[in-house]
A protein has these predicted regions:
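Active-site/ligand-binding neighborhood in enzyme catalytic cores
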Residues: 130-241, 248
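Active-site-proximal substrate-binding core of FAD-dependent oxidoreductases
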Residues: 489-507
Length: 507
């Protein structure tokens, strides 16, 4: 028998499930959030807090992002913590360096300096990207369900998206297609796509490609405090509205009790909890393992296909002396190792740790066939990151203090003493901790969405990064608001019957 009951149980503590839980708790629903084995957002090494996966605010100006933050009373806090810098992101090519500015005239002047031969094409592309951003904002601001599944949802989505220059699959105008196929600028904008979204470049539609490129030109920022601060802020909002957060607990089974709801079993406390709705926020493969009949998800995979891992995200972190970093290197840079291959790319992030020290992080994608998540360390990850940084930071080895790569299975090492360093959470390391980037057989809703929010099990919803991987941060907000809208509408109908004119009738 269940010992407690909640309206909604949310599984996972990543961005999408936490946003959904906060929105539902704000509406008065009793919400329980379980960590479901999601690792901590940061770890400590030699007194320095490190986030393996940073939170890049690409698309923070989107109407859905701003309205959601406004509902959660976080808009002002996020605005104050967004890093304010003159240049948005740097493109570091083998023979060129560009600072991408949000002001069109400064950006075009930068292009004229590095690529004077394509200034006219770049001007047309920049103007068209601004128009696409405005058109897409009108669709996002309508509060639609992504992806639309019911008849009314599809009808409303089709009417809203009619004015778009893209078809239902998101095909139409291709961003930067006016340049030569192997032009360095086209390669750089193609290489940025997987680092701002959950799709590899070959899976992006024209609409998602143009939307992300417009986000890059309009502003990409980092949060002061990173994902660690944002996660704690969402925890605080959920608790303040009467919800409960248990980041160390996880459910090991879900039992469907028909119309009476669901019951979940907690592995650590051997507790059984009842609920009406479940929002699953980790990979869909983990949801299949929780259900008593794993074949129940087969109907969904027959309709939209089963995602398969295509690549993995990994990062390497260096503590260096601040005087060894060139002033021209910005806080966020895209380091392209080749002018023609968009796969050989590192994203460089830097932040001050002390007055004379700086943390420099390099993240990249590793193809699936190069990774064995269950065994041997990945020696090439650290070496290739060192080569990428040495190409932009002269005499890097003379100023480097230590290096750590939590995903390759190698211990952190000090450069000068050549010794291993102790770190917190040594068990949460290795190739198995890398996040996967999936390959999706089908995509829908202008190419933004891959999986559906509704699962074949009644009352169980999918609320993770696999629903709308095409837009990255903006897609996470679209997923969370869509699931919260679907679940909340059911309770609003019941509330109307309970409080409306029917409650005043007597038989």
């Amino acid at each position: 028998m269940p010992t407690s009951f909640y309206d909604v149980v949310v599984l996972g503590t990543r961005l999408e499930p936490l946003l959904c839980a906060a929105l539902l708790a704000r509406e008065g629903l009793r919400v329980l959030v379980l960590g479901q084995g999601v690792p901590e957002p940061s770890y400590s090494l030699a007194g320095v807090e490190i986030e393996p996966y940073g939170l890049t605010m690409a698309g923070a100006q989107s109407p859905i992002v701003q309205s959601t933050l406004e509902e959660l009373a976080l808009r002002q806090d996020v605005r104050q913590r967004m890093a304010d810098r003159a240049n948005v992101v740097q493109l570091l090519l083998p023979e060129h360096r560009l600072d991408v500015y949000p002001e069109a005239d400064r950006w075009l002047a930068e292009l004229g300096r590095e690529f004077p031969g394509v200034r006219r094409q770049a001007t047309d592309i920049t103007r068209t990207l601004a128009e696409v951003r405005s058109e897409f904002d009108t669709v996002v601001a309508r509060g639609l369900v992504w992806p639309p599944e019911t008849f009314l949802e599809r009808q409303r989505f089709s009417l809203t998206a009619t004015a778009q220059r893209f078809d239902r699959q998101g095909q139409g105008w291709t961003s930067w297609n006016q340049l030569a196929v192997r032009h360095p600028l086209r390669t750089a904008f193609e290489a940025v796509l997987p680092h701002l979204s959950g799709l590899v470049p070959s899976q992006h539609s024209d609409s998602t490609r143009a939307r992300l490129h417009a986000h890059v030109l309009s502003g990409v920022s980092d949060l002061s405090g990173g994902w660690s601060w944002f996660q704690e802020a969402l925890f605080a909002r959920i608790r303040s509205w009467g919800g409960d957060v248990r980041p160390r607990d996880r459910a090991d089974s879900i039992r469907h009790d028909g119309r009476r709801g669901h019951s979940i079993h907690l592995a650590r406390t051997d507790e059984e909890i009842g609920c009406s709705q479940i929002a699953h926020g980790t990979a869909i493969g983990e949801l299949s393992q929780l259900l008593p009949e794993r074949g129940s998800m087969a109907t969904m995979f027959e309709r939209v296909g089963e995602p398969r891992a295509r690549a993995y995200r990994c990062s390497v972190h260096f503590l260096v002396e601040k005087r060894g970093i060139p002033d021209a290197l910005g806080p966020l840079a895209l380091r392209c190792m080749s002018e023609t291959d968009p796969n050989q790319v590192f994203v460089l992030r830097s932040r001050d740790v002390e007055s004379n020290r700086m943390l420099l992080s390099a993240s990249r994608l590793v193809e699936e066939h190069l990774v064995d998540t269950g065994s041997s360390p990945l020696h090439f990850v650290r070496e290739e990151a060192l080569d990428a940084i040495r190409g932009v930071v002269p005499f890097f080895d003379e100023h480097a203090i230590w290096v750590d790569s939590p995903h390759d299975g190698l211990p952190p090492r000090a450069f000068r003493a050549d010794t291993e360093l102790p770190c917190s959470d040594p068990w949460a390391r290795g190739p198995s901790t890398m996040r996967a980037v999936y390959d999706y057989p089908t995509r829908r809703a202008l190419g933004v969405c891959a999986l559906t929010t509704r699962t074949p099990v009644r009352g169980v919803f999918l609320c993770n990064e696999q629903v709308a991987p095409g837009l990255g941060l903006e897609g996470s907000f679209l997923t969370a608001t869509s699931v919260a809208k679907i679940i909340g509408s059911q309770y609003r109908r019941r509330d109307w019957l309970r409080r409306g004119p029917w409650a005043q009738r007597s038989v």
